[in-house]
From Swiss-Prot:
It catalyses: L-ribulose 5-phosphate = D-xylulose 5-phosphate. The keyword Metal-binding applies. Induction: Induced by L-ascorbate. Repressed by UlaR. This is L-ribulose-5-phosphate 4-epimerase UlaF. The gene is ulaF. It comes from Shigella sonnei (strain Ss046).
Length: 228
């Protein structure tokens, strides 16, 4: 697990590097599907002092199998998503400013241009709010459940992120680094959407044919963007 712990550590260190976290407001995890184990940032440990060996390994029930610290408080959310969507290899949660603002507003991040369409096939959805019973009960588990309720059976890698109402953004990818990459993009397109709608409140969504072109040329069966 040392290699995966190193990858998760590096991905976590990318969060402050890209300006996605303040203090310890975020974390990254990744899963080893063959072993059924998840590596995640320890709860509340400062990035300045954190080491790869500080990463915590849990099984799919959340039991710590390796590590001296408690795992992130978001562990139950991540495990619920890993169980439901086998294509996910890494997940990240932050409170990045602009994506969190859309979450607090209770609004999906609208697909307004090609930067968005290169990564997200449609709006980045916003979940419903959790009920008082859901919050007072198994809060983190129920956060995962409301994300799943919103995504349904859609391929999560086609829209690799979501904003949880009154909470903040979650993003995911094929591995930990891909998840962070998508979280960075989500924050940028959230900022772009806010600015664009401020300039033109009547701005419409990106044309569907342009959305399809930009997404499919990178992610479709006949993708031709980038190098093989």
């Amino acid at each position: 697990m040392q290699k995966l712990k190193q990858q998760v550590f590096e991905a976590n260190m990318d969060l402050p590097r890209y300006g996605l976290v303040t203090f310890t407001w975020g974390n990254v995890s990744a899963i080893d599907r063959e072993r059924g184990l998840v590596v995640i940032k320890p709860s509340g440990v400062a990035y300045e002092t954190m080491k790869a060996d500080d990463m915590v390994v849990v099984d799919m029930s959340g039991k710590v199998v390796e590590g001296e610290y408690r795992p992130s408080s978001d562990t139950a959310t991540y495990l619920e998503l890993y169980r439901r969507y086998p294509s996910l290899g890494g997940i990240v949660h932050t409170h990045s400013t602009h994506a969190t603002a859309w979450a607090q507003a209770g609004l999906a991040i609208p697909a307004l241009g090609t930067t968005h369409a290169d990564y997200f096939f449609g709006d980045i959805p916003c979940t419903r709010g959790l009920s008082e019973e859901e919050v007072q009960g198994e809060y983190e588990l129920n956060t995962g459940k409301v994300i799943i309720e919103t995504l349904g059976d859609a391929e999560p890698l086609h829209t690799p992120g979501i904003v949880v109402y009154q909470h903040g953004p979650f993003a995911w990818g094929k591995d930990a680094h891909d998840a962070v990459h998508n979280a960075v993009v989500m924050e940028e397109v959230a900022k772009m959407a806010w600015i664009a709608r401020s300039i033109n409140p009547q701005l419409n969504h990106i044309d569907s044919f342009l959305m399809n072109k930009h997404f499919m040329r990178k992610h479709g069966p006949n993708a031709y963007y980038g190098q093989k």
